[in-house]
Amino acid sequence: MHGLLLAAGLLSLPLYTIAHTQPSGALSRRGVDLDAYRLPEKSSYTNTNDVQENSAILSLNAGSYVDVATKLVKQTIPSATFRVVDDHYISDTGLGHVYFRQTINGLDVDNADFNVNVGKDGKIFSFGNSFYTGKVPSASLTRDHSDPIQALNGARKALKLPVKTEKATARATNRGEYMFKGTSGALSEPTAKLVYIVKDDGSLALTWRVETDIGDNWLLSYVDAKDSDKVHNVVDYVAHATYQVYPWGINDPTEGSRQVFKDPWELPASPFTWISDGRQNYTTTRGNNGIAQNNPDGGTEYLNNYRPNSRNLRFEYRYSPSMNPPKSYTNASITQLFYSANTYHDLLYTLGFTEEAGNFQVSNGNRGGKGNDYVILNAQDGSGTNNANFATPPDGRPGRMRMYIWTRANPPRDGCFEAGIVIHEYTHGLSNRLTGGPDNTRCLNGLESGGMGEGWGDFYATAVRLKRNDTRNTVYAKSAWASNNPGGVRAYPYSTDFEINPLTYTSVNQLNEVHAVGTVWATMLYELLWNLIDKHGKNDGPKPVFRDGVPTDGKYLAMKIVLDGMKIQPCNPNFVQARDAILDADKALTGGENKCEIWTAFAKRELGTGARYNRNNRTGSKEVPNECK
């Protein structure tokens, strides 16, 4: 369920505790703690209010939005060398999003990013920055390094990777990378590239970035370029017709019955429908947005795996929660997963997760972005139980979702039938593609940023399941059905009542695991959700209604500005910066109409105006701006 972090899944906490973690994922099973290798969180964020007070920044308004953004980077850090990442775009709100990567001695600094948001008026709106500003090493030092095979072996040994390298050879490519041939144990050929990284102490290290996809983990390992036994940091990309299905909005079998839907796609979001990619029409669970199949052995092959085929396009199969074993309802499981993932794709598209923003599609139809990256949807995946995960590589490479069987009930329960799990997993793809730009899915790798990656998944899953008669007093537990526990898999259920959920910003001071941190973030977003619903009402339909580009109700408005905030925030943001990005997203979308509702929601949970981030001692605040008192 990580998009970019440890290859753990949905369940990482025992049911009623917040401090203890239950490790999961392949590397954890091999005794390797990837949390110890997280990249440092070094980003700053200058919100739109601060920009408005800086005349030097406001004067930058000549040329295209990319030109204006480039001038800002040069003005902010004149001595820096950098490149424009080729994934800039103008979103549906009119903001231009431009991403830069710092370079030193011709090499990328892999965790030194600068993102600039440019307003419709051609002026700087806000920006984030994690560029290195220390002493630049001599270019001659870039020639003093180990060979790439030594680096691959260093990563293999340190992380206990199941990759055999005895016959490995390295071949240089025209992209400045080395591709390894003769290895076994990885899903694709490993690669290595010489890059710098900024370490936790602020110094610079020359490293080999070794990429290995081993299924449960898809790793970028930063191996010291001189000492191959030293791994500085690690990023993990994994985080894990008619259709008879539980309808969208029904979270699990306890909430409703299955129904038959005809042609349920939204053509503006899926112009080829769900069962075509524009080149070929399919009679199975395959199309432009995803390909769903059974994967009982947990292997890496998917194209030739079993999926239901219906020449008359009737994907209607028997299922009830009492059926056992799970293989007796494989067709229904695959169909439900295919339906849920595609429906969410279409909803996110209407909210702004489009081709140019890095969404998951085979064909982008000349709408920008990189294609050939539908989501591989594995139902009843045999590589694990009681969990799920999602791997998010950069734009142009397929995402991968693994859905497991949950064994905490008799008979076992299939995670594909709990929509909240599917939504949570897919949201890792959303947040990783939007934060830092589609080509950089390494921007949710810190404890707080990774925690928010988990929290966004819970937030969207909860927002989608809201019912007509729900109020701000409604309480929802995460994955209660699959886990066979009314309290779900989080330390607390989502509630606006402190007696039910007491979490605040300073709770994070006692937490060291991303799912626990994510529960705090999702709790704050649940407060935001209800503040906006109380102000604007709630649309109980499956998609938003827009007026001048703004959702007319509070539920979809909250989902929209949270999504837009991901586009605006810096790489590896903390809670304070992500809060500011949501405020800025509302200002860009509505002119700041909901400023006080947003501030009040965050301040209730100690993320008010005086909140301060310090990774060891966060300061909470329940203060709001004077105009919101």
Curated annotation (Swiss-Prot):
**A GO MF label:** metalloendopeptidase activity
Which InterPro entries does this chain map to? FTP_domain, Fungal_virulence_M36, Peptidase_M36, Peptidase_M4/M1_CTD_sf
Domain of life of the source: Eukaryota
**Main localization of the protein?**
secreted
Any binding details for the cofactor? Binds 1 zinc ion per subunit.
Compartments, as annotated in UniProt: Secreted
Q: Which residues are glycosylated?
A: 281, 331, 469, 617
Sorted keywords for this record are:
Glycoprotein, Hydrolase, Metal-binding, Metalloprotease, Protease, Secreted, Signal, Zinc, Zymogen
Q: Which residues form the active site?
A: 425
UniProt-listed Enzyme Commission number(s): 3.4.24.-
Q: Which GO biological process categories is it annotated with?
A: proteolysis
* Entries under SUPFAM superfamilies matching the protein: Metalloproteases ('zincins'), catalytic domain
Q: Which cofactor does it need?
A: Zn(2+)
Gene Ontology CC terms, in alphabetical order: extracellular region
The function of this protein is: Secreted metalloproteinase that allows assimilation of proteinaceous substrates and probably acts as a virulence factor.
- Family label: Belongs to the peptidase M36 family.
State what protein this is by name.
Answer: Extracellular metalloproteinase 10
Naturally occurring in which organism (per UniProt): Coccidioides posadasii (strain C735) (Valley fever fungus)
